[in-house]
């Protein structure tokens, strides 16, 4: 496999999330310390579609942001050459400028694009957006932090 991509097995080694909360299916490209482009394939089998909404399934906006935060985590871990362990945790610490532009529905492929803006002392700032068919679905500035817990 290309060093600049990740399949689901590599993602599972880098993220603690598991079904139904793992929201990154593949990394298409990663430019160390700069940016990542990843995919979330949205299917009708997603558990959140049972109640959001039964008559017209739409991916909750907070889960689009979570998918972006998970892609950001992959970028952060790659930037600092680390694999998370049981003694550390990666927090989604904040978001600014969030704008939802279009609904995401079953069958859509959510392309996650995250750019690392700044990192200092375990705090990471990102500019993030997600697209469907080259159309902006959501954009935000994300703040995340890596902390030792042991």
Curated annotation (Swiss-Prot):
One of its GO terms (biological process) is fatty acid biosynthetic process. The keyword Transport does not apply. Keywords: Cytoplasm, Lipid A biosynthesis, Lipid biosynthesis, Lipid metabolism, Lyase. It is found in: Cytoplasm. Its EC number is 4.2.1.59. SUPFAM superfamilies: Thioesterase/thiol ester dehydrase-isomerase. It catalyses: a (3R)-hydroxyacyl-[ACP] = a (2E)-enoyl-[ACP] + H2O. Signal peptide: none annotated. The active site is at 52. It is an enzyme of class 4 (lyase). Disulfide bonds: none annotated. One of its GO terms (cellular component) is membrane. It comes from the Bacteria. One of its GO terms (molecular function) is (3R)-hydroxyacyl-[acyl-carrier-protein] dehydratase activity. Gene3D superfamilies: Hotdog Thioesterase. The keyword Cell membrane does not apply. Belongs to the thioester dehydratase family. FabZ subfamily. Involved in unsaturated fatty acids biosynthesis. Catalyzes the dehydration of short chain beta-hydroxyacyl-ACPs and long chain saturated and unsaturated beta-hydroxyacyl-ACPs. HAMAP family: FabZ (MF_00406). This is 3-hydroxyacyl-[acyl-carrier-protein] dehydratase FabZ. It comes from Albidiferax ferrireducens (strain ATCC BAA-621 / DSM 15236 / T118) (Rhodoferax ferrireducens).
């Amino acid at each position: 496999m290309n060093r600049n991509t990740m399949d689901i097995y590599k993602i599972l080694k880098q993220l603690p999330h598991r079904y139904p909360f793992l929201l990154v299916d593949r990394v298409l490209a990663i430019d160390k310390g700069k940016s990542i482009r990843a995919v979330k394939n949205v299917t009708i089998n997603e558990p959140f579609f049972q109640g959001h909404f039964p008559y017209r399934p739409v991916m909750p906006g907070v889960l689009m942001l979570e998918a972006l935060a998970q892609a950001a985590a992959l970028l952060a871990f790659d930037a600092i050459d680390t694999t998370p362990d049981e003694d550390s945790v990666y927090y989604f610490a904040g978001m600014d400028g969030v704008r939802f532009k279009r609904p995401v529905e079953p069958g859509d492929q959510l392309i996650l694009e995250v750019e690392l803006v700044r990192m200092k002392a375990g705090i990471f700032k990102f500019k993030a957006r997600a697209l469907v068919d080259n159309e902006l679905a959501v954009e935000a500035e994300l703040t995340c932090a890596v902390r030792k817990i042991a």
